[in-house]
Amino acid sequence: MAAPEVLESDVSSSITLLKNLQEQVMAVTAQIQALTTKVRAGTYSTEKGLSFLEVKDQLLLMYLMDLSHLILDKASGASLQGHPAVLRLVEIRTVLEKLRPLDQKLKYQIDKLVKTAVTGSLSENDPLRFKPHPSNMVSKLSSEDEEESEAEEGQSEASGKKSAKGSAKKYVPPRLVPVHYDETEAEREQKRLEKAKRRALSSSVIRELKEQYSDAPEEIRDARHPHVTRQSQEDQHRVNYEESMMVRLSVSKREKGLRRRASAMSSQLHSLTHFSDISALTGGTAHLDEDQNPVKKRKKLPKKGRKKKGFRRRW
């Protein structure tokens, strides 16, 4: 019962689509005929064209031909099962989809060439206008300088060698211009406050408060000191590298000193009664502890006038 109603509703829409299709076909046909006439007359030179565009046009033309053949068979009531046009349409559609990334890469160059051929010049906002030119890197001598250099070459062999060296100018890059350090005292104080806040958030007091009021399971470590933790991570990385590369790495004197210093810092007992400064989190002014800002030792300079005592040889 519903089939005749569906067919009647499809007839009106099909007639409208066929009229629109006929109008579009007539417009495209007129445009193609005009373009073909210009090409045959030699107005447009197609000898040095892109083979990629030619292949793409041929594929689109074959796709439209098979599609129109398929529409004709479907309109005549023939069965489309096993139709050879369907397989060709699938094959051409697959090739066109594979060509899409290549088309996107060549789109900018093709548009630029077409625009240059039409207008005869590049646009002002073209990014290739701002590319570096190697010719600008070579120092261009004036005609007077060239004449003077030629006159100096004719005087003597020595002067000729000097002028030859002077004529081949080398590119000298410009020196960096010193920039004024315009950081204000307020910005410097803000950076110092942010640094103090980061130090306070990573302090042992805040870490213990988090562990006390947090619902997460307690994390137990062998060594909680940051120096020991960092040293253990470096040792583990060294062991993994040696085991994977089958190579034994040597330890320098500096690394040995750092290990001894880290073990000494972790074994000190003065940190039992030491609490980190968290005044930066409460709105106060953070101050540096003595441990954070140690006093530098002065280097002992050799006194003048003293001579090294030599050893007497005993006979």
UniProtKB/Swiss-Prot annotation:
Biased composition (Acidic residues): 144-155
Assembly and oligomerization: Interacts with CPEB1 and EIF4E.
PANTHER family (alphabetical): NEUROGUIDIN, SOMETHING ABOUT SILENCING PROTEIN 10-RELATED
Gene, per the UniProt record: Ngdn
Cellular component aspect of the GO annotation: axon; chromosome, centromeric region; dendrite; filopodium; mitochondrion; nucleolus; nucleoplasm; small-subunit processome
Keyword Nucleus: yes
Tissue specificity note: Expressed in testis, ovary, spleen, kidney, hippocampus and cerebellum (at protein level). Expressed in testis, ovary, spleen, kidney, brain.
Modified residues (N-acetylalanine): A2
Name used for this protein in its record: Neuroguidin
GO biological process: regulation of translation; ribosomal small subunit biogenesis
